[in-house]
A protein has these predicted regions:
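Residue-level detector of alpha-helix initiation sites
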Residues: 23-24, 82, 128
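Adenosine-phosphate binding glycine-rich loop
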Residues: 115-150
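Short glycine-/small-residue-rich Rossmann-like dinucleotide-binding loops
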Residues: 62, 78-79, 126
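ADP-ribose/adenylate-binding Rossmann-like module
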Residues: 73-77, 84-109
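A structured beta-alpha segment of the ubiquitous adenosine-cofactor-binding alpha/beta core
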Residues: 61-67
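Hydrophobic, well-ordered beta-alpha structural blocks that scaffold small-molecule cofactor pockets
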Residues: 1-45, 49-53, 58-61
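Alpha-helix C-terminal capping/helix-to-coil transition sites in glycosyltransferase folds
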Residues: 13, 69-71
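Glycine-rich, charge-decorated loop segments at or immediately adjacent to ligand/cofactor-binding or catalytic sites
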Residues: 107-117
Length: 150
């Protein structure tokens, strides 16, 4: 696996495109929204949960290459792996960093498991190799932080 630099990014002025609106896309959107991201979602169908979320720009249709105009970050999470790969290649040409749900080798970044308190944010990532290790580490760190606050 390539080494990934753990980096915390201010998303308030970033334009984020999410292609797809299923379970994985919804989970990614929820994570991004916690950090003030401006998110446009392109998909032919939307989960009801997404339709109820405020602050999203929902575009009800399939992806077109023009959707990548003025995008800083792309989250590609359709249920069509060849389409995901095609969009990822378009992002590479345009210099858009991307996360691709169907192929971690195409990802420029991963979504870490996060722990947020009033004064600390912790991100944990196994690079997609072993989610159970990430889950255990998150649980252990959460417990540690709870004990420190007592």
């Amino acid at each position: 696996m390539k080494p990934y630099f753990p980096m915390f990014v201010n998303l308030e002025d970033k334009r984020i495109l999410v292609v797809g609106a299923g379970t994985i896309a919804t989970r990614r959107i929820k994570a991004l929204m916690k950090f003030g991201a401006s998110i446009r979602v392109v998909a032919p169908l939307f989960e009801h949960e997404l339709e109820r979320m405020e602050g999203l720009d929902l575009i009800n249709r399939g992806f077109t290459p023009g959707d990548l105009e003025d995008v800083d970050i792309a989250v590609i999470a359709t249920n069509n792996a060849p389409l995901n790969e095609e969009i990822a290649r378009m992002c590479e040409v345009r210099g858009i960093i991307k996360n691709v749900s169907s192929d971690q080798t195409l990802c420029d970044f991963f979504f870490p498991a996060t722990i947020m308190t009033d004064d600390i944010i912790v991100g944990i990532c196994s690079g997609g190799n072993d989610p159970s290790v990430t889950k255990k580490a998150r649980s252990d760190i959460e417990e540690y932080l709870k004990e420190k606050r007592r």
